[in-house]
């Protein structure tokens, strides 16, 4: 029972605290009580400079833990960025060539002495633009002179700046989209959707490169199907990258299938057995697939309507007009979503996101071929929106709108003519100009994942310069510097990548 706690002996200074010890002092009991009251340590921090302390608090030395405790992410949490193949870029526009076909797959056998027919190979040149990530840090001269528990404060702030950049870069590998915010690079989801073989959103979502789980968890058969699809596209699936919850739910599917033999001499060690399931790879029919999780692959979490803008430079919240049910929509996917919903929308630019605005009241989907047209406009303000985030509640909410968690389901460009994304100016997913149509393609509260051939034949990050620290001119007694990253991811072969969408949870 030793070492369970400290005791009074660990705090002795001189005579101690017992009655016999106090009796050795030439003080009466009343005097001792007054002295004890006068020098009571209290719970005030030693750094209190109010000048009003009437006890021993002013004499205390602070007890500060010597090491800095992290309550945010660590470098080890940035996983996909570390795994992503990287190479040098030499221009702000990185071009690449694709050989898309050796020629048509026609008959090729000929008669003796006959001239074979001619076939032309097909080449395509494409490009991605290098984009620029950066953050400015500042440390005053005075801060550099005082003692801290973090060592060199400039080095600490440099590390913090690097981690801030890497978090943004890691997340943008998935969700970056220059058609939404033009300063962003195109992440893997954007480049996958930009595949030229699909003319519109219907063709893309119905293709074999997108596997829609409609709220179900990811299972073995989904991976096998994806691996087979990639094989038919002349690719070798070897990497699944997903948010942690997707892989956790994949593992829990095995719990009910586990068999543990308890008892018997051959199982003497089961008394301290470890349960659970760790899955690092999946053996498909066509090869091993590594499992990799990344917390920054997760979608933005749901939030309440009272959530404030994320930046003082974010646009003003949009002005809502209406949410109208559209009947007889042959492309609707509300067959599994008949019920009531709330809708909301926020505006975004390169600085951040506005507060959200409710669009309409409760919207009722009564038929499988219903869809919803949302009408809203930009609100005048100092900062113009580049795009809008559409939010939706889960089906049949039991609380009023202001107490209901709203989930982002799509991001809509403010302007543009892209046939897959659409835009508010020209209509989204079959809606008229100025409207955004929700056909239940994207389910609230779900996740996404990617299955791909994770090598330089398919993906690569082209980096214009190493991650760098650049000093700024001194305009005050402070060291200011920037942490900068220039580059862009490139998906050379979007057809060698499977996108799992609407992955649900196993609660």
Regions picked out by a protein language model, each given a short descriptive name:
Residues 303-444:
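Disordered, low-complexity "stalk" and linker segments at domain junctions of extracellular
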């Amino acid at each position: 029972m030793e070492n369970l706690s400290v005791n009074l002996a660990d705090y002795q200074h001189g005579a101690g605290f017992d009655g016999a010890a106090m009796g050795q002092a030439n003080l009466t009991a009343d005097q001792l009580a007054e002295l004890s009251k006068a020098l009571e340590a209290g719970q005030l921090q030693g750094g209190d400079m109010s000048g009003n302390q009437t006890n021993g608090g002013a004499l205390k030395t602070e007890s500060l833990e010597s090491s800095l405790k992290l309550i945010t992410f660590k470098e080890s949490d940035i996983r996909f960025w570390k795994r992503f193949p990287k190479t040098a870029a030499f221009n702000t526009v990185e071009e690449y060539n694709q050989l898309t076909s050796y020629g048509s797959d026609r008959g090729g056998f000929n008669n003796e002495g006959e001239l074979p027919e001619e076939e032309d190979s097909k080449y395509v040149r494409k490009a991605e633009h290098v984009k620029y990530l950066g953050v400015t840090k500042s440390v005053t001269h005075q801060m550099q002179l005082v003692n801290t528990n973090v060592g060199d404060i400039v080095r600490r702030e440099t590390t913090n700046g690097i981690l801030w950049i890497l978090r943004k870069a890691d997340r943008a590998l998935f969700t970056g989209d220059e058609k939404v915010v033009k300063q962003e690079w195109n992440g893997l989801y954007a480049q996958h959707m930009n595949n030229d073989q699909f003319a519109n959103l219907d063709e893309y979502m119905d293709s074999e490169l997108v596997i829609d789980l409609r709220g179900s968890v990811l299972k073995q058969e989904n991976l096998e199907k994806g691996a087979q699809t990639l094989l038919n596209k002349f690719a070798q699936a070897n990497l699944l990258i997903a948010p942690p919850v997707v892989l956790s739910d994949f593992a829990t599917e095995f719990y009910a299938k586990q068999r543990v033999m308890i008892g018997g001499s051959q199982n003497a060690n089961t008394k301290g057995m470890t349960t659970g399931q760790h899955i690092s790879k999946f053996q498909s029919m066509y090869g091993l697939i590594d499992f990799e999780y990344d917390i920054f692959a997760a979608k933005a979490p749901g939030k309440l309507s009272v959530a404030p803008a994320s930046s003082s430079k974010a646009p003003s919240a949009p002005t809502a007009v209406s949410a109208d049910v559209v009947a007889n929509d042959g492309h609707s996917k509300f067959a599994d979503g008949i019920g009531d919903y709330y809708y909301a929308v926020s505006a975004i630019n390169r600085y951040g996101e506005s507060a959200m605005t409710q669009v309409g009241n409760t919207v009722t989907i009564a038929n499988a071929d219903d869809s919803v047209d949302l009408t809203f406009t930009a609100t005048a303000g100092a900062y113009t929106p580049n795009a809008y985030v559409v939010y939706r509640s889960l089906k049949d909410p039991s609380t009023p709108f202001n107490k209901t968690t709203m989930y982002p389901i799509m991001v809509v460009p403010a302007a543009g003519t892209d046939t897959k994304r659409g835009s508010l100016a020209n209509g989204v997913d079959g809606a008229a100009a100025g409207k955004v149509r929700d056909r239940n393609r994207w389910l609230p509260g779900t996740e996404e994942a990617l299955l791909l051939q994770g090598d330089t034949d398919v993906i690569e990050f082209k980096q214009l310069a190493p991650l760098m620290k650049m000093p700024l001119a001194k305009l005050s007694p402070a060291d200011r510097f920037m942490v900068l990253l220039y580059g862009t991811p490139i998906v050379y072969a979007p057809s060698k990548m499977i996108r799992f969408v609407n992955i649900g949870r196993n609660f």
